[in-house]
Curated annotation (Swiss-Prot):
Gene Ontology cellular-component terms listed: cytoplasm
Protein family per UniProt: Belongs to the ArgJ family.
Catalytic activity from the UniProt record: N(2)-acetyl-L-ornithine + L-glutamate = N-acetyl-L-glutamate + L-ornithine; L-glutamate + acetyl-CoA = N-acetyl-L-glutamate + CoA + H(+)
Gene Ontology biological-process annotations: L-arginine biosynthetic process; ornithine biosynthetic process
Site (Involved in the stabilization of negative charge on the oxyanion by the formation of the oxyanion hole): T120, G121
Protein name: Arginine biosynthesis bifunctional protein ArgJ
Organism encoding this protein: Bacillus anthracis
Catalytic residues (positions): T194 (nucleophile)
Pathway: Amino-acid biosynthesis; L-arginine biosynthesis; L-ornithine and N-acetyl-L-glutamate from L-glutamate and N(2)-acetyl-L-ornithine (cyclic): step 1/1; Amino-acid biosynthesis; L-arginine biosynthesis; N(2)-acetyl-L-ornithine from L-glutamate: step 1/4
EC number(s) on file: 2.3.1.35, 2.3.1.1
Gene that encodes it: argJ
Length: 407
């Protein structure tokens, strides 16, 4: 049983709150007038885990990071640039990514295999290595919160807000910290995709155990968000565990294993929601919960089908309670359902009961649809499993942003 009372959100926490971590973000000239290069550094080689995009076209930095992590399952630094994806840049792009790793290792005095690299931005443009070379040597990570916040700014592209979260958990009666930072706004339809996320913790946990937990939780969080249905070439989630907390090693047999997993899930869920809420041109976060299904996978599939529907997204943007678009999406999900037993609530107002339309106050509904967060609940009465997905509305601004992205 998960000890929820053993987990507390730390409102002013960041990726440098867990013991052993420091961070920095700075402007080196990849983006005009904005921070565009950052680093997270650990005092010791940290156990690590990662989940990557499933796009068959994988960017050079992602390939280099895979190479680093598979060597020992440890990392000590992550270097990230924004403004340039270093994707579809051929062999030269791969060489540049390896050089970026080598430059970081030299600057921080680390083994190359302990350094990961990540890039995000425009695809198909060579990475300006003269700028990268001059920039990396200026990185001086700080253990203070301003270092973490500057890093969160340096990894942004079309994002409007930074995305950070932090939790404290009790393991073996002692405080253990876990935190995360992310970027992502457009081209979001992960399996894993369209976003970068970096998680730090001082938990004592080995690479393979952390990988199991991260892979499992990613399927319930990051893989359940969608903004525009496009899957990126670059993006990934990396978790680093310094092991500097004074607890016994955490594994699946540990009495507090579920506490750790729940805390990791909360970090990933917080970041996933922030990404969905910050979707390009978004004005509303949409949460879809599907209940009463035979399997969790089926529930998640239906939820993602609904939240990814352009017609549902535009209806929410227009504050139109058009539940017909919701039930149509349910039918398109390819999950076997009973079309006669569907209940739907929109902002806790019943709009469909046993697949029959319900009378509701248009005035009350309009008022609730003006809120920033919209919740759609679907009850299928087929089983006991549930699943959720997150997305955002689709606005005129989304088209403007993406029509002019390169300019």
């Amino acid at each position: 049983m998960i000890k929820v009372a053993s987990i507390t959100k730390v409102e002013d926490g960041s990726i440098v709150t867990p013991k052993g971590f420091s961070a920095i973000g700075t402007a080196i000239g990849l983006k005009k007038g904005k921070k565009d290069l950052g680093a997270i550094v650990c005092d010791v080689p940290a156990s690590c885990a990662a989940v990557y995009t499933t796009n068959q076209i994988q960017a050079a930095p992602l390939q280099v990071t895979k190479d680093s992590i598979t060597t020992e399952g440890k990392l000590q630094a992550i270097i990230v640039n924004s403004g340039n994806a270093n994707a579809c840049t051929g062999m030269k792009g791969l060489q540049d990514a390896y050089e970026m790793r080598a430059l970081g290792a030299e600057h921080f005095g680390l083994k190359e295999k302990y350094v990961a690299v990540a890039s995000t931005g425009v695809i198909g443009v060579p990475l300006p290595m003269d700028i990268i070379r001059k920039g990396i040597v200026t990185l001086i990570p700080a253990k203070e919160e301003n270092g973490a916040h500057s890093f969160s700014e340096a990894i942004l592209t079309t994002d409007l807000i930074t995305k950070e979260t932090c939790y404290e958990m009790i393991i073996d009666g002692k405080k253990v910290m876990i935190a995360g930072v992310a970027k992502g706004s457009g081209m979001i339809h992960p399996n894993m995709a369209t976003m970068l996320s970096f998680i730090t913790t001082d938990a004592r946990i080995e690479h393979d155990v952390l990988q199991t937990a991260l892979s499992q939780i990613t399927n319930h969080t990051f893989n359940q968000i969608t903004v525009d249905g496009d899957t990126s070439t670059n993006d990934m989630v990396i978790a680093m565990a310094s092991g500097l907390s004074e607890t016994k090693p955490i594994d699946m047999e540990h009495a507090d294993w579920e506490t750790f997993v729940f805390a990791l899930q909360k970090v990933c869920e917080d970041l996933a929601k922030k990404i969905a809420q910050d979707g390009e041109g978004a004005t509303k976060l949409i949460e879809v919960n599907v209940l009463g299904v035979q399997t969790n996978e089926e529930a998640k599939k239906i939820a993602k089908q609904i939240v990814g529907s352009s017609l549902v997204k535009t209806a929410i943007h227009g504050e139109d309670p058009n539940w017909g678009r919701i039930i149509s999406s349910i039918g398109q999900s390819e999950v076997a359902i009973n079309p006669n037993t569907i209940d739907i609530t929109l902002q806790s107002i019943s709009v469909l009961k046993n697949s029959e339309p319900q009378t509701f106050s248009e005035e009350e509904m309009k008022e609730r649809l003006q809120e920033d967060e919209i919740v759609i609940n679907v009850y299928l009465h087929l089983g006991k499993e549930t699943g959720s997905a997150w997305g955002c509305d689709l606005s005129y601004e989304y088209v403007k942003i993406n029509a002019c992205y390169r300019t």
